Amino acid sequence: MPKVLFEKGYRFFFFSNEGNPIEPCHIHITKNGNLAKYWIKDSAELSDSYGFSAKELSEIELIANKNLNLIKEAWNE
């Protein structure tokens, strides 16, 4: 599972060859046992969240949007 980014304690990663058929570009985020998934399009869009507060999700979304190009490049490698 490639780690793409680590910022403010959040680990951003994805699984290689996830889903059948392969899912569109997305990123998983974890911190302190909490987990979220964002679709990566023109901006990061929340798919699922388990345990994160609304404030944390806002922070995650800001980080993801700031790093969209990095996430997309890692996905396409």
Predicted regions and their residues:
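Alpha-helical structural elements
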Residues: 5-7, 33-34, 70
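C-terminal structural segments of small proteins and small subunits
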Residues: 51-77
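Generic secretory/membrane-interface signal
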Residues: 2-3, 20, 61
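A short, structured beta-strand/loop element
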Residues: 15-54
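Negatively charged, low-complexity tracts enriched in Asp/Glu with abundant Ser/Thr
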Residues: 1-12
